């Protein structure tokens, strides 16, 4: 399989994630769409690294996965706090956390 197929798949996944972030109001779904966008960028990084025959893209993808793991911890903690205080996981309720 050539790199073009992986890049097209990565673009499709990134677009789906972008549309999900812009359209959805549920914080958990938005969070999953952000993770989908990060995984799409990882796929593109690994595909380009494979094409050029070096490990730089794979190392960058590894660091993106490490940052995504930290993001999962912080993001889920914020979503749980929103749900505990407002009994809703809507993104609109996130601005109410300061009160």
From Swiss-Prot:
Keywords: Cell membrane, Membrane, NAD, Quinone, Translocase, Transmembrane, Transmembrane helix, Transport. The keyword Membrane applies. One of its GO terms (biological process) is ATP synthesis coupled electron transport. Its EC number is 7.1.1.-. GO terms for molecular function: NADH:ubiquinone reductase (non-electrogenic) activity; quinone binding. One of its GO terms (cellular component) is plasma membrane. Gene3D superfamilies: 1.10.287.3510. The keyword Transmembrane helix applies. Pfam families: Oxidored_q2. It is found in: Cell membrane. It is a multi-pass membrane protein. It catalyses: a quinone + NADH + 5 H(+)(in) = a quinol + NAD(+) + 4 H(+)(out). InterPro entries: NADH_UbQ_OxRdtase_chain4L/K (IPR001133), NUOK/Mnh_C1-like (IPR039428). Its main location: membrane. The chain crosses the membrane at residues 3-23, 28-48, 59-79. NDH-1 is composed of 14 different subunits. Subunits NuoA, H, J, K, L, M, N constitute the membrane sector of the complex. Belongs to the complex I subunit 4L family. NDH-1 shuttles electrons from NADH, via FMN and iron-sulfur (Fe-S) centers, to quinones in the respiratory chain. The immediate electron acceptor for the enzyme in this species is believed to be a menaquinone. Couples the redox reaction to proton translocation (for every two electrons transferred, four hydrogen ions are translocated across the cytoplasmic membrane), and thus conserves the redox energy in a proton gradient. This is NADH-quinone oxidoreductase subunit K. It comes from Nocardioides sp. (strain ATCC BAA-499 / JS614).
């Amino acid at each position: 399989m050539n790199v073009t197929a992986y890049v097209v798949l990565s673009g499709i996944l990134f677009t789906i994630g972008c549309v999900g972030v812009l359209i959805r109001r549920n914080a958990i779904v938005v969070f999953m769409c952000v993770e989908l966008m990060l995984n799409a960028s990882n796929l593109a990084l690994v595909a380009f690294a494979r094409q050029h025959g070096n490990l730089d893209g794979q190392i960058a993808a590894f660091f993106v996965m490490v940052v995504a793991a930290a993001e999962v911890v912080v993001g889920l903690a914020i979503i749980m706090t929103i749900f505990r205080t407002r009994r809703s996981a809507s993104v609109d309720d996130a601005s109410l956390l300061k009160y």
